[in-house]
UniProtKB/Swiss-Prot annotation:
Pfam families: IF-2B
Protein name: Methylthioribose-1-phosphate isomerase
A GO CC term attached to the entry: cytoplasm
Membership in a protein family: Belongs to the eIF-2B alpha/beta/delta subunits family. MtnA subfamily.
Function: Catalyzes the interconversion of methylthioribose-1-phosphate (MTR-1-P) into methylthioribulose-1-phosphate (MTRu-1-P).
NCBIfam families (UniProt xref): eIF-2B_rel, PRK05720.1, salvage_mtnA
Native source species: Aspergillus terreus (strain NIH 2624 / FGSC A1156)
Pathway per the UniProt entry: Amino-acid biosynthesis; L-methionine biosynthesis via salvage pathway; L-methionine from S-methyl-5-thio-alpha-D-ribose 1-phosphate: step 1/6
Record-annotated active site: 254 (proton donor)
Amino acid sequence: MTLQAIKYNNGDLAIIDQLQLPHVEKYVTIHNSEEGWHAIKDMRVRGAPAIAIVAALALASELHGLMAHDKLSPEAEDVQTFVVEKLRYLVSSRPTAVNLSDAARKLEVVVAQSARAPGATGKTVATAFIQAAEEMLVKDVEDNKKIGEHGAQWILKNSLEGHGKATVLTHCNTGSLATSGYGTALGVIRSLASADSLQHAYCTETRPYNQGSRLTAFELVHDALPATLITDSMAAALLASKKAGVNAIVVGADRVAANGDTANKIGTYGLAVLAKYHNVKFLVAAPLTTIDLNTKSGDQIVIEERLASEVTSIRGPRDNTGSEDVELVTVCTAAKGINVWNPAFDVTPAALIDGIITEKGVMEKDSAGMFHLEELF
């Protein structure tokens, strides 16, 4: 059974606290937009599709609570203003992820249209928002499964010529923990496994935040898929290994520019360079909401820089053998006083990408080496 990282029912929202994984599987309840903002900023939830869904549902939960306690303004315009302000606040929690800003824009349109409707009230505007947010949750899962199927079929056709099983390397976490369910790049691996076409999956540790070792490895073990964890610095040796026989690298995306340049977790660019040298297919898996046609190229993408402590220390459980309680501790791993550069993302040039997998299919470059992503819309 695929992991369920986001649980939502009629205003009740709970998410797996990813800061506790893989040591403790604990759900955290989100009641309002402020708690949603902190869950995203503190990386209790991460992954571009997931944070968009959690942000929308956090505000939906807040509106449910206001209506339940009769604290919602009866005026449609007041509720519209309230929702727009909260959405813009939520977007500030992770500016790099286009899914979040895209979802916010769409939801602003929903409440604007609802507020202009004849007889509109605060309740009708709030209800329209809640319905739209809940529909986003359902659609994201459906889109992820389509992405998985399209990606699996492409790999089998283009990397294996229709014969044998695929061995795939992935980076960071792009599964149920990064989306509303199933996953994007990890969804491709799941689809290969469902078709009995997965030979083996490799996942990178993904320093410095270890999303690969903490989260992707957790999902692969949870789903009982044949998988192996490597450190980031082992990727070149893995691709060079005939024994490993990696057929494709599949990664997710936080933002895809109009020309195909892709911002994703730091280390993605390096994997793309290695893939090109070793003649291994390099694919980006992302829903259409991740594609930003207003961003013409990767040099326009704002890259978030994070705390130095993420590089100079590591967090994990104290080894209390035989104890059911897990005590998480932070251990320093670097010389004190050293300067640190910690960009959360890098940009992979479109020239290094063989295909971009969306819910509509796999977009490839034309004979001139150009993506035409506008054709997907």
